From Swiss-Prot:
Has three domains with a flexible linker between the domains II and III and assumes an 'L' shape. Domain III is highly mobile and contacts RuvB. Residues 147-207 are annotated as: Domain III. This is Holliday junction branch migration complex subunit RuvA. It is found in: Cytoplasm.
């Protein structure tokens, strides 16, 4: 299973990109907004899931773990394939999907091209109670200083990859951001080091 890619963007347009990883170009299906955010020649990191069918292999890429998790839940709903799942995420954020399901409101899904009334209702019913883990961690108080979202997001992904629960990692990142000077939290390496120091071996052992 290809769970993520990090490499150089060779092309990006519409809802797709090609990312060069070690000399191999991977074609990845993305939301249009995600594809537009990529720049040819820049390094990109995407979370991925591979959809295997009898006649094709398709790699879908996502900017965050929450988006990937929602995609996989949507793709598991009867009548919703990967194309419709990525269409939903092209219109709605993971939080908006969770809010609509929590409110038993199928209107946002009916507004997505390719999703009919019956499928929209089925999405709401099928995903009820399954989306709590797909929400992003609460942001720090507005009175607290913040790190650039790309920096804090990258650190959060790294910590989750190291085995910390996303909630624990998110809280630790927020605490470090709130308690350090801007110059000490303006890079992924520095913020990650400070957050790991705060979590400490005792915290890791307690997980």
């Amino acid at each position: 299973m290809i769970s993520s890619l990090r490499g150089t963007v060779l092309s990006a347009s519409g809802g797709a990109a090609v990312i060069d990883v070690g000399g191999v170009g991977f074609a990845v299906q993305l939301t249009p907004d995600h594809a537009r955010s990529l720049r040819v020649g820049d390094e990109a990191f995407v979370h991925t899931t591979l959809i295997v069918r009898e006649d094709s292999l398709q790699l879908f890429g996502f900017s965050g773990l929450e988006q990937l998790q929602v995609f996989e839940l949507l793709n598991g709903v009867s009548g919703v394939g990967p194309k419709s799942a990525i269409s939903v995420l092209s219109v709605l954020s993971p939080d908006q999907v969770a809010d609509a399901v929590a409110a038993a409101d199928d209107a946002p899904f009916r507004a997505v091209s390719g999703i009919g009334p019956k499928t929209a209702k089925l999405i709401v019913v099928s995903l009820t109670g399954k989306l709590a883990a797909c929400r992003r961690p609460s942001a720090p108080s507005a009175r607290r200083p913040s790190a650039p979202s790309s920096v804090s997001d990258s650190v959060l992904v790294a910590l989750v990859g190291l085995g910390w629960p996303e909630k624990v990692a998110g809280e630790a990142v927020a605490e470090v951001i709130a308690g350090t000077a801007e110059s000490e939290r303006d890079s992924v390496q520095t913020l990650l080091r400070l957050t790991l120091a705060r979590l400490g071996p005792a915290n890791q052992a307690a997980r």
